[in-house]
Amino acid sequence: MKNCWIVGASSGIGFELAKKLCINGYNVVASARSLENLNILKNQIEDDKKSTKDSQNCGDIMIEAVDVEDYEALKKTWQNILEKNHKIDLVIFASAIYEQMDLRDFDLELSKKIIHVNFDGFLNFLHLITPHFMQNKNGHIATIASVAGYRGLPKSLAYGASKSAMINLCEGIYPELKANNIALSIINPGFVKTRLTAKNNFPMPFLISQEQASDYIYQGLMAKKFEIHFPKKFTFILKFLRIIPYKIYLPIINNIYRKNHQK
């Protein structure tokens, strides 16, 4: 069986993805700040395994509580995982903070917190796991970004910037990882029904469930796709907006802002 470490597995997409991978034969180490939620995840996986006909082919679940902002704690967790599993085949960074924000409600400390968790946390994660994969010249690194990182969007002041930085970083390191036989996947979901998107007070077209999202991601990971984006009816619209010039893009975004965000 292959071994996987998921950081940010206590809720949302990370939670469902941990379940999906474990049922499909991965030994999963699930990490997050909330030990309580990790125990809920563990219990759900154990229950799912009992009700699965092919339970002998399911993987095991192990939980390790850790905060991605704490580099030394994250390092200790990674060392513990390697001591117990020796080799990790797949790592997934799913930690994130999301808050709607524009200039009228610009919270500097919250903005720094969003950047620190979403992007600096990924840097901490990447710095720790890369030597293991480079040494083995094998493995798979994945991270959950967002279509909000494609281009600047209203109400996404800090969150969009953090995801854009993540996408840019992954594009930059892809050639070096590929040269060392290491797969890299950047996961860009559209709107997924989670506790994060529950805060939104604007229309969310093509909203999908966490379970649907985990299915899309699992299929993409198994195919070792560089970008896993979904639902495509929505993401292709944003991909088009990504490539058009500013003189076309900005009037479109300005119109959306005036319709949905001005009070």
Show which residues each predicted segment covers.
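Conserved glycine-rich cofactor-binding loop
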Residues: 10-11
